[in-house]
Amino acid sequence: MSSEQSAPGASPRAPRPGTQKSSGAVTKKGERAAKEKPATVLPPVGEEEPKSPEEYQCSGVLETDFAELCTRWGYTDFPKVVNRPRPHPPFVPSASLSEKATLDDPRLSGSCSLNSLESKYVFFRPTIQVELEQEDSKSVKEIYIRGWKVEERILGVFSKCLPPLTQLQAINLWKVGLTDKTLTTFIELLPLCSSTLRKVSLEGNPLPEQSYHKLMALDSTIAHLSLRNNNIDDRGAQLLGQALSTLHSCNRTLVSLNLGFNHIGDEGAGYIADGLRLNRSLLWLSLAHNRIQDKGALKLAEVLRAFELTHTEVVERRRLLLEKGTQERSRSPSSSRHGDSKTDREKSQMVGISNSALVDKTDKTQTMKTPKGLGKKKEKSWELAKKEEKLGSGQSPTQGTPKKEDATKAGKGKVTIPEQKPSRAKGIKIGSREKRSILLESELVVEATEVVNPLLEPVEHRDGKVFMPGNKVLLHLNLIRNRITEVGLEGFLATVQYQMQFSKAKSASKGPVGLLWLSLAKNCFAPQCPAYAIIQELMLPRDPIKAKLREDEAMAFFP
């Protein structure tokens, strides 16, 4: 027992607590040292610090620039830039080929591999599809983004990589989840792009505030705008109509506007018609698949024929006429000075020619006459020259008078392009430097007066009211699948008949002739409706596409 009791005391395991204390002290010192001296982690060899996207200089290759900028923005997974697939021509295999494929192709009987499944689902991955002008990666012509959300940061990437694309013509965004904020950012991006960008398509992007009219601002360069399937209602149509034209402003760049597959009703159609009253740039308008009934159809038809000006429009017309008169009166002294300078130069040339002719005549008659007669001839020639010089400071009987008449006519009458063409042709024939400079000045005046306010167009006064000829610039109007009945058809029939008479009267002179294509099919009337049949008959010879087809058929039958 004593040995058993003394054993624990003599056991070598007794000093363990001491050793534990010493080891604990060591560990605490190590932890303290680790806290005091943090370990320095060296970056791997070849890895650089992340670069900011502002420092990157774009190369003009969209695929490279977009990938690099997305990486610098912190994107790990981003859409790829691919060529837009083109539809292949339909291929109909023969019976022998189809039998051989069923016998020889093992893929038809076996299960699909993992690679084939991945290749199938690659189609649904977000991509940026591009069309190239040539087989050059720098010649991107159109951009298509379809079915994935475009965020604010992606638009920031586009603001860097799209401006270097010098041949970009169109941007198409289909169901990309735009908001009013991202639309504003997108609109701010457009002026940075190339001047060749004229077409924008925003389809399937409904916005709560319906701020699509911002794309049609006065400083916008968009010529073709498509806003299909955006749930645009009458409130959005009001904003679009005001963007087309108001009493004091007008969009002069938009050529085509597609508002199909929206929720525009009679009230919205009336707002669009109000925008067409003073707009003289829109050639193509589609309101297909909307909710327009007879009231809205009649408003659209009314603006395309002679319509009555409102009181505010009449007042604005008078103000514009007064301004035009004061401008012409202020221009008339400068134009007369130009005319006088022209006649002075021409008369000085005529004086030189007459003097040389007189000298030649005196040389010829020197041997025929006595010195006294020669002296008399010389005196007479100098008197004639002095008289012509005096006339040169005033008016020339041959050239000065018609020039002054032209100047007074130009000051009194309306300045138009056809009236300026003869003067330009005369200036080109003369060919002197001074006349070329005057010609350039006249061209600048013509360009400034090219865009005439529609309120200054010729009007007709009837029963104390002022009537404008109507919008003859719109060539294409699509109203398929609305809710128009025979009542609305009568309004369009009157419009077509009026435009036919107007075009016959204007056949000799060039200018807008009115609608060339009008589509009213699949509305709330029978196809055999008499008014619809008459409209179709009247519009058939005006349709340029069908007229071209008839010409081709005639050439085929009678080569």
Curated annotation (Swiss-Prot):
InterPro entries: Leu-rich_rpt, LRR-containing_protein_71, LRR_dom_sf. The keyword Repeat applies. Residues 1-56, 324-427 are annotated as: Disordered. Residues 1-18 have a biased composition (Low complexity). Keywords: Leucine-rich repeat, Repeat. Pfam families: LRR_6 (PF13516). It comes from the Eukaryota. LRR repeats lie at residues 172-193, 196-216, 221-241, 253-266, 281-302. Residues 28-38, 324-348, 380-391 have a biased composition (Basic and acidic residues). SUPFAM superfamilies: RNI-like. This is Leucine-rich repeat-containing protein 71.
